[in-house]
């Protein structure tokens, strides 16, 4: 039986070590993929699948991509959640005995991307790890390999808290123990849409001792080691740029669960998953990539410390007041490149000369930035100037060494300036002098042969040559040159003198290129030692950029600086920060909001499309803006510090997610009332809409009462159940407000104004008219509405005693009364009809998704039609 070729044996041996990755196997100028890798890659990358002989059995499936354009193909695979192992030739094929030695030099995974073309400038690219301990606690670790950031957090509130924490970060890959229960692994993959990787080795590596100085708990050390061991195993190179681990004390930040982040559209919109239309879109006036990433991190973790909030607000105030100085600062910051990721590439070894020029240009701006900061009349801003350290020696070294416009490649020369290195100058002189001699040779040979068209040229295959056109060959003295190449219209020759000069020139050029590469590596390694300083500068500049961004957006959008206290929230003429920017005509209607000790729950009524949800989101968004240190859209504002914000606002339910709309409502409501405190903000929009009227009304009232009596969180509760407005008489901290609307000539006009008291009608039919439903349908609905209202007027209203009892007994009594008045149906159904009825009785509506409910209804209806 035929054996595999030695090369394919080598491939299989390497592939067996990287079974969960596409193996990009270097063959000459291509990366080749074989077997199942080739079949899948051909589909994913839309490239041709071929076959090659492997020395055993049937031909082997194969596909390949050119190495010089492989990055785009790798990016496609990484974006789809795959891993790629890069297998390179690690010895010179000219000196190799047998098969050229190859080994994997790097594993690229969704969470360990370093190539700039695969990264988004304004976003972190986190890899995380999750470790579970016997005491029930979890430790989450985040690392952004491109910036060197390391952060850890304890999670002591159970599995849901783990999911919420991961959801709030741009996580691409999570490293876990292979012993984590399978059902939890499935939840991580499905709920977070991440790649899972495994690392069971958590032994602490002494190499990481300096990085873990801030960790004083064995659980933190093990969790950190799990992630670092995985990164070191996959990357196989220097991790010199990794920063000391920072422990995130979650209790110092506002908690925003996954529902709130989604419903409030903090960083992306619900429908389009786009930054445009989110709060981040409005606030982002940063001019550096570092600042954009920092802004997003701040937005996801608002502060709880009033002192720290006010420290940020002080700097924003200073930037706000100094318009001209701020514009000068913005112009300077625009010329600062991404220092965090530049330092990462320097440490990683994939930096090029253009990157070093970007570093030089960025650092050279620091003196001007310092001078501009000193012009502000604000101590906190001038203190920033003193925190910046100008690395003058590094800038001077780069100025002397690297040419201003270097090539991308660092292995083809033309990187180092003249005068930087004596030996390099000698090689260059030899090369230049040789080329000058060749130019003189051409003139000399033309004179001596009399052939005016004779020329001296060069190509990579044949080197230097003397070219004579065929019509002039008869003028060439016999034996003067040695024939080298025959062309259609000419002959090419050499002589001994030319061959000697060629050798000298090429040796000089080769040595020059080699020396330039060595010098570049030396310069890079010198800068590598200064990475902590570069990262410190990046940290200061990124925060400065965010704070000037807050000042810029506050000035352009007419925001006001908020005050903070412990109890009261009072915003005068507040505006929704996003909606007012989308409505560029300036027609947004501002509204007030007041919460204090006597009034911590607002029950909002009013028609659909009137602005209830917008008002609720507005309160939450302005609170978040204040707690990250930004001014807010209002005329005047006093805010309290919220420890958590919970939301249940619709428009994001998934019909086929496996959970009904009502179940989603209940889960989100449960999450809020189970975790909220008296320092929290709760937004509940139309609770109970997903079930029957009586069930929904009963649950809505019970939730209102529970929050009022047991939690005392500041709450905005919108409802279509107008009966609930009577609760104002019995719940002393609840106040009715409504969104004003008026009828004019048979049409409804939404004024979007919040007024005290309950709404007097819902205007639902008017909304249907705006939706352009058929006139016949609208007219019929109006008739039915009049009949229902007449019937309703004959019924008693719920008494205060019944409302205070915590039960909607009135509605239950009415329901029982209707049942009693219904005539008993004669049992005339045949067995088949009765079977359908029994099926209908047994349907558990609350366990069905809307799509499943429609399918079940169709089946039952079809069964009845047969009879």
From Swiss-Prot:
For this entry, the protein name equals: DNA mismatch repair protein MutS
Biological process, per Gene Ontology: mismatch repair
The UniProt entry, under Gene3D superfamilies, shows:
1.10.1420.10, DNA repair protein MutS, domain I (3.40.1170.10), MutS, connector domain (3.30.420.110), P-loop containing nucleotide triphosphate hydrolases (3.40.50.300)
Give a GO molecular function annotation for the protein. Answer: damaged DNA binding
Which cysteines form disulfides?
none
Query: What Pfam families does the record point to?
Result: MutS_I, MutS_II, MutS_III, MutS_IV, MutS_V
Q: Which residues constitute the signal peptide according to the record?
A: none
Lineage, top-rank taxon, reads Bacteria
* Recorded GO CC terms: cytosol
Give UniProt keywords alphabetically.
Answer: ATP-binding, DNA damage, DNA repair, DNA-binding, Nucleotide-binding
According to its UniProt entry, what is the function of this protein? This protein is involved in the repair of mismatches in DNA. It is possible that it carries out the mismatch recognition step. This protein has a weak ATPase activity.
Q: Does the keyword ATP-binding apply?
A: yes
Q: Which SUPFAM superfamilies match?
A: DNA repair protein MutS, domain I, DNA repair protein MutS, domain II, DNA repair protein MutS, domain III, P-loop containing nucleoside triphosphate hydrolases
CDD domains named among the record's database cross-references: ABC_MutS1
Q: Which HAMAP family match?
A: MutS (MF_00096)
């Amino acid at each position: 039986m035929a054996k595999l070729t030695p090369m394919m044996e080598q491939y299989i041996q390497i592939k067996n070590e990287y079974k969960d990755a596409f193996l990009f196997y270097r063959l000459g100028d291509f990366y080749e993929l074989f077997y199942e890798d080739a079949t899948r890659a051909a589909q994913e990358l839309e490239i041709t699948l071929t076959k090659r002989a492997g020395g055993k059995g049937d031909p082997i499936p194969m596909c390949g991509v050119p190495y010089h354009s492989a990055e785009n193909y790798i990016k496609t695979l990484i974006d789809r959640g795959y891993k790629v192992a890069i297998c390179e030739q690690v010895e010179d094929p000219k000196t190799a005995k047998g098969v050229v030695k190859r080994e994997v030099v790097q594993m690229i995974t969704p969470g360990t991307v370093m190539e700039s073309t695969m990264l988004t400038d304004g976003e972190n690219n986190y890899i995380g790890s999750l470790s579970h301990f016997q005491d029930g606690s979890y430790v989450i670790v985040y690392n952004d390999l491109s910036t060197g950031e390391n952060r850890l957090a304890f999670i002591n509130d159970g599995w849901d808290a783990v999911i919420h924490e991961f959801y709030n970060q741009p996580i691409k890959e999570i490293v876990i123990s292979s012993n984590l229960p399978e059902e939890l692994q499935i939840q991580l993959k499905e709920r977070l849409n991440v790649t899972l990787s495994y690392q069971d080795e958590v032994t602490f590596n002494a190499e990481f001792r300096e990085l873990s100085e801030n960790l004083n708990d064995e659980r933190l050390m093990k969790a950190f080691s799990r992630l670092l061991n995985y990164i070191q195993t996959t990357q196989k190179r220097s991790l010199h740029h990794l920063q000391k681990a920072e422990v995130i004390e979650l209790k110092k930040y506002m908690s925003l669960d996954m529902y709130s982040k989604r419903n409030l559209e903090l960083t992306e919109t619900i429908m389009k998953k786009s930054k445009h239309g989110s709060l981040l879109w409005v606030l982002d006036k940063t001019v550096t990539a570092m600042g954009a990433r920092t802004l997003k991190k701040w937005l996801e973790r608002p502060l709880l410390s009033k002192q720290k909030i006010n420290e940020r607000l002080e700097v924003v105030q200073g930037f706000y007041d100094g318009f001209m100085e701020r514009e000068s600062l913005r112009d300077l910051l625009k010329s600062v490149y991404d220092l965090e990721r530049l330092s990462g590439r320097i440490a990683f070894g994939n930096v090029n000369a253009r990157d070093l020029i970007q570093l030089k240009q960025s650092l050279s701006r620091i003196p001007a930035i310092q001078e501009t900061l000193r012009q502000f009349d604000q101590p906190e801003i001038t203190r920033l100037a003193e925190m910046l350290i100008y690395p003058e020696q590094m800038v001077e070294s780069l100025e002397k060494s690297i040419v201003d416009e270097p090539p991308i490649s660092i292995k083809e020369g033309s990187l180092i300036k003249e005068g930087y290195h004596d030996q390099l100058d000698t090689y260059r002189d030899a090369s230049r002098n040789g080329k000058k001699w060749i130019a003189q040779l051409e003139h000399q040979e033309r004179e001596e042969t009399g052939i005016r068209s004779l020329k001296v040229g060069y190509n990579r295959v044949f080197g230097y040559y003397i070219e004579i056109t065929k019509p002039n060959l008869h003028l060439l003295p016999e034996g003067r040159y040695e024939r080298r190449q025959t062309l259609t219209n000419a002959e090419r020759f050499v002589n001994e003198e030319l061959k000697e000069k060629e050798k000298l020139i090429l040796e000089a050029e080769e040595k020059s290129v080699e020396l330039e590469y060595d010098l570049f590596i030396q310069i890079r390694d010198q800068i590598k030692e200064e990475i902590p300083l570069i990262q410190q500068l990046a940290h200061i500049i990124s925060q400065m950029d965010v704070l000037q961004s807050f000042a810029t957006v506050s000035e352009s959008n007419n925001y006001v600086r908020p005050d903070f206290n412990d109890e009261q929230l009072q915003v005068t003429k507040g505006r929704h920060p996003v909606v007012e920017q989308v409505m560029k005509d300036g027609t947004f209607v501002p509204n007030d909001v007041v919460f204090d000790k006597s009034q911590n729950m607002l029950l909002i009524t009013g028609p659909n499309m009137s602005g209830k949800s917008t008002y609720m989101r507005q309160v939450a968004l302005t609170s978040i803006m204040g707690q990250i240190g930004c001014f807010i859209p209002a005329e005047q504002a006093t805010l309290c510090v919220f420890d958590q914000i919970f939301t249940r606002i619709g428009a994001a339910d998934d019909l086929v997610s496996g959970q009904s709309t009502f179940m989603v409502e209940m889960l989100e409501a449960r999450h809020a009332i189970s975790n909220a405190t008296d320092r929290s903000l709760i937004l509940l929009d139309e609770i109970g809409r997903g079930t029957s009227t009586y069930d929904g009304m009963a649950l809505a009232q019970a939730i209102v009462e529970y929050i009022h009596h047991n939690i005392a969180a500041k709450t905005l509760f919108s409802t279509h159940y107008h009966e609930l407005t009577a609760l104002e008489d019995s719940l002393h901290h609840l106040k009715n407000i409504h969104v004003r609307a008026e009828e004019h000539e048979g049409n409804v006009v939404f004024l979007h104004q919040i007024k005290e008291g309950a709404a007097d009608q819902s205007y639902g039919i008017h909304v249907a008219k705006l939706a352009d439903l058929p006139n016949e349908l609208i007219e019929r609905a109006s008739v039915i509405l009049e009949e229902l209202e007449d019937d309703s007027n004959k019924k008693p209203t719920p008494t205060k005693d019944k409302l205070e009892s915590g039960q909607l007994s009135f509605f239950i009594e009415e329901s029982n009364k209707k049942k009693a008045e219904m005539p008993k149906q004669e049992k005339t159904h045949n067995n088949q009809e009765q079977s359908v009825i029994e099926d209908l009785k047994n349907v558990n509506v609350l366990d069905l998704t809307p799509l499943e409910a429609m399918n079940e209804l169709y089946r039952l209806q079809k069964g009845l039609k047969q009879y």
